[in-house]
């Protein structure tokens, strides 16, 4: 205390050796906060903590020696109050900490006992050496506080580990309880399934007994009728007919598991009605063919009479050569039939006669069909001689005969051809739709593999200016699956030039392979051959002058006659094509086009294979 002689008088506490600057602080400390001398390690920390703030307060006035004491009375009191308040809070906090730590001191592992003992033993020697030194007591208080903080952190870690272990145990217990609940749920479901299986087994036994009873009854009309309806022999039907489609529908229904007697009975009734209609239709055709055969002798007699009259007229004029008018009259008389004939019995069509040359001998041409009534046969040409590059009359135009299609896919039910003209590789925008044709089985003849369809349509193209850039463009559209259920889908196309470089019609029987889409009318024949073919589909048509349309109308259309058609040659090689046909001698001139009557009565679109004739289509023009 002698070292503080220059400082204001400090009042020590007689119990805990703490010093104060005023008697009020000392009295308050003695009454409320004094805890006496530290007798154990637990109370030493509290006593040291109490002495922390007074030491700081005692050190502060050392920096202000020589300052009068009277002016510092009011600030000293405020500082003392704040220091007292902080000291009180710290003491209370330390006391509560000690009370909370006492139950856990005995549970701390022995691992920590050594450091605690050593750490507690260290500050006793300086305290015993300098009990009254404030700096030593402050340092001891700091060490004790740091040690307590470390101990509390260790205890908190131990508590945290123990809490985690308890959490794991709780989770294990919860999982065990959840597994038991799931096991109970599974057992309940198994019991329910076993009960359901028992009920199902009972129902099956009852059903089996009922089936055995029904099988045991010999004269059960219901079962016999159902078996008869289900397993009755299927009526045979020609492919491509309505009865065949109904039969396919019945087979598909049975294949999919259908066993309804009512539905099967209706299908069977529809098949019977369709077969009856097909039979009636075939009988009607045979009757019509028989009537036509009966009229044939009458027509032949009328033709012979006309030929005799022509011969008499020739004899009245003398042996002079016949003129162009007589030749035209003779051609008309031989071409115009006087009734409907069966197409296979008609004579082969002939081309219009050509005028004779002066001094030209009359040789007998092979292949002509005449009655040999004194008439020279060189005036009539066979059909093959007519088809080839020929002079063209723009006023009369040309005619296109669409005969049939071969190599169609099996999934196509109906087909339709859309035609149009193109000039200089650009479509004119006018298209014509041919009547839809039913796909039929292939004929027993060589040709493309696949079904066929008979088009049997003709289309006049009047007043068409000749040009090598004019071409015919055809697009094939098909129906698949159920017919007429949706719009047809385009599948292929083809293009054909109508004139050569000399502006002659490329008349002939042409066989055109259909090409894959997209459609491009600007392609030449060489470029068109580079496009892949659409399967094996091919179009068979005839291109003739308008003056030859009447003859070609009488030609029969048979899908088996593929050998009569040829592939179109390049435009530059038309001379070789022309050389393959029989051409007249020098001096022959193509006769002027004769006035043709409209052939509106030629329409015959019988279904099935066999001879057909072309039907009319509206004319095409630019």
Swiss-Prot record:
Q: Which residues form the signal peptide?
A: none
Which UniProt keywords are listed? Coiled coil
Q: Which region ranges are annotated with the description Disordered?
A: 334-356, 584-622
- Taxonomic lineage of this organism? Eukaryota, Metazoa, Chordata, Craniata, Vertebrata
Q: What is this protein called?
A: Coiled-coil domain-containing protein 17
Q: Which residues form a coiled coil?
A: 81-102, 146-207, 294-320
Compositional bias annotation for Pro residues: 344-356
| Ranges annotated as biased composition (Basic and acidic residues) | 593-615
């Amino acid at each position: 205390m002698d070292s503080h002689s220059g400082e204001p008088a400090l009042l020590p506490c007689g119990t805990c050796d703490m010093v104060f600057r005023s008697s009020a602080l000392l009295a308050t400390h003695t009454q409320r906060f004094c805890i006496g001398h530290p007798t154990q390690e637990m109370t030493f920390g509290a006593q040291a903590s109490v002495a922390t703030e007074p030491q700081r307060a005692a050190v502060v006035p050392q920096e202000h020696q020589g300052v009068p004491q009277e002016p510092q009375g009011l600030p000293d009191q405020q500082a003392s109050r704040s220091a007292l308040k902080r000291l009180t809070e710290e003491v209370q906090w330390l006391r509560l900490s000690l009370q909370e730590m006492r139950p856990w001191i005995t549970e701390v592992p022995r691992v920590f006992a050594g450091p605690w003992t050593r750490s507690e033993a260290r500050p006793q020697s300086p305290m015993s050496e300098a009990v009254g030194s404030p700096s030593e007591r402050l340092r001891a208080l700091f060490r004790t506080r740091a040690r307590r903080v470390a101990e509390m952190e260790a205890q908190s870690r131990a508590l945290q580990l123990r809490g985690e272990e308890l959490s794991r145990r709780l989770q294990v217990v919860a999982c065990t309880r959840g597994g038991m609940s799931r096991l109970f749920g599974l057992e309940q479901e198994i019991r329910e399934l076993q009960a359901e299986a028992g009920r199902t087994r009972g129902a099956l036994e009852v059903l089996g007994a009922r089936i055995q009873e029904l099988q045991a009854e010999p004269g059960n009309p219901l079962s016999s009728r159902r078996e008869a309806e289900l397993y009755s022999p299927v009526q045979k039907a020609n492919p491509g007919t309505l009865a065949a489609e109904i039969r396919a529908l019945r087979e598909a229904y049975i294949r999919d598991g259908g066993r309804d007697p009512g539905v099967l009975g209706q299908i069977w009734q529809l098949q019977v009605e369709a077969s009856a209609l097909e039979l009636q239709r075939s009988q009607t055709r045979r009757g019509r063919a028989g009537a036509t055969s009966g009229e044939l002798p009458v027509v032949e007699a009328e033709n012979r009479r006309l030929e005799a009259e022509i011969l008499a007229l020739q004899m009245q004029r003398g042996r002079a050569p016949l003129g162009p008018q007589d030749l035209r009259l003779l051609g008309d008389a031989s071409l115009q039939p006087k009734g409907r004939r069966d197409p296979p019995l008609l004579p082969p069509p002939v081309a219009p006669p050509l005028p004779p040359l002066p001094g030209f001998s009359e040789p007998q041409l092979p292949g002509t069909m005449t009655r040999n009534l004194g008439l020279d046969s060189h005036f009539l040409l066979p059909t093959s001689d007519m088809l080839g590059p020929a002079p063209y009359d723009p006023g009369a135009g040309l005619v296109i005969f669409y005969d049939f299609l071969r190599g169609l896919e099996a999934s196509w039910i109906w087909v339709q051809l859309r035609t149009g003209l193109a000039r200089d590789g650009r479509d004119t925008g006018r298209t014509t739709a041919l009547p839809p044709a039913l796909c039929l089985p292939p004929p027993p003849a060589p040709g493309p593999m696949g079904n066929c369809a008979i088009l049997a349509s003709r289309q006049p193209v009047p007043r068409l200016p000749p040009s090598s850039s004019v071409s015919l463009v055809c697009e094939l559209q098909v129906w698949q699956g159920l017919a007429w259920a949706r719009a047809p889908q385009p599948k292929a196309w083809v293009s054909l030039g109508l004139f050569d470089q000399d502006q002659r019609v490329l008349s002939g029987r042409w066989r055109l392979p259909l090409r894959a889409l997209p459609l491009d009318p600007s392609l030449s024949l060489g470029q068109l051959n580079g496009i892949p073919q659409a399967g094996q589909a091919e179009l068979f048509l005839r291109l003739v002058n308008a003056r030859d349309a009447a003859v070609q109308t009488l030609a029969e259309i048979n899908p088996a006659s593929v050998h009569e058609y040829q592939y179109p040659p390049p435009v530059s090689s038309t001379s070789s094509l022309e050389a393959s046909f029989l051409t007249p001698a020098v001096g022959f001139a193509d006769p002027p086009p004769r006035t043709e009557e409209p052939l509106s009565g030629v329409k015959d679109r019988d279904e099935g294979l066999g001879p057909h004739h072309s039907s009319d289509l509206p004319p095409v023009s630019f």
